[in-house]
UniProtKB/Swiss-Prot annotation:
Protein's name according to its UniProt entry: Cytochrome b6-f complex subunit 8
Localization of this protein: Plastid, Chloroplast thylakoid membrane
The encoding gene: petN
One Gene Ontology cellular component: chloroplast thylakoid membrane
InterPro entries: Cytochr_b6-f_cplx_su8_sf, Cytochrome_b6-f_cplx_su8
GO molecular function, one term: electron transporter, transferring electrons within cytochrome b6/f complex of photosystem II activity
Species annotation: Huperzia lucidula
UniProtKB keywords: Chloroplast, Electron transport, Membrane, Photosynthesis, Plastid, Thylakoid, Transmembrane, Transmembrane helix, Transport
UniProt keyword RNA-binding present: no
Spans through the membrane: 3-23
Length: 29
C-alpha cells in the first residue's frame, strides 16, 4: 500500500466513525 491508499482508508474510517457517533447522539443512545 502507498501513502495515498493509507490516507484514503484512514479518512473513510474516521468519517464513518464520526457519522456513527452523530447518529447515536441524535437517537439518544
Amino acid at each position: 500500500m502507498d501513502i495515498v491508499n493509507i490516507a484514503w482508508a484512514a479518512l473513510m474510517v474516521v468519517s464513518t466513525f464520526s457519522l456513527t457517533l452523530v447518529v447515536w447522539g441524535r437517537s439518544g443512545l
